[in-house]
Amino acid sequence: MERTELNAQPVVLDVDGSVGTLPGELRLPLQDWQEQVRFGCGLRRFAQFRAALDAQLPAAHGTALMGSGDFHHLSWPLIERCITAQALSAGRPLRVVVLDNHPDNMRFPWGVHCGSWVRRVALHPAVSHVHVAGITSGDIGRAHAWENYLTPLRAGRLSYWSAGVDTGWARRLGVDSAFRSFASVADLSRTLARMLREQAQPTYLSIDKDVFAPEVVRTNWDQGRMLESEAMDIIGALSGQIVGSDITGDVSSWRYATWWKRWMSAGDGQDTQIGAQ
């Protein structure tokens, strides 16, 4: 099951101008969509963006770079495109591995946003399981338990891999089997890498740079504690299995014109004004 996706032409979804020039890149000019889709949007607007993306994106490409973590929900259409391109199905499903400091499975009643997209992917019939790994955020702690979508956790379609977070509430709600808790990110990474190596299957890898410790890279979201070597061990364990991938988490600033985006992004502790003029 050898794959060459990581060596194919990288594609930049250039919505916010934060991704530097890459050798051999394909860059899609999508800046006109920034206010509309950044952080989140309604499903109708997202469908319009997806149509614009489909019109420009080739069927085959390498890793997609999406800029700020505010655009992590763009992984949803990319994963569905991957499923179609690879002719995957319930009989031959896709596994999704997300390296992220947040679960991205939080309630959002107005459509989809960067913190809610995982639920939609996990419940796709051609996706066997989503593993969100590297979580040190309080988003899966007791105070925010009510914000997590429980359906994919209860259905056995989604697992949280975390370190240093009290997730005792999961046992009380009967979803503790979906939680893999570790004393350290190092233990988490070793265990995940071993599982991925032993249970090979077509895999989509999505990396949000906020999973990394601040000494590795700086983002404008609260960050985790993963080291570069630990991420590389996980990627190495997926050798020959990756059929699609994306990276998000670059730093960019944006002054939202939409009131609820200003309110929600501030409530999430995000700094959207880094370097803003």
Feature names for model-found ranges:
Residues E2-Q277:
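Conserved alpha-helical scaffold segments that buttress catalytic/binding sites
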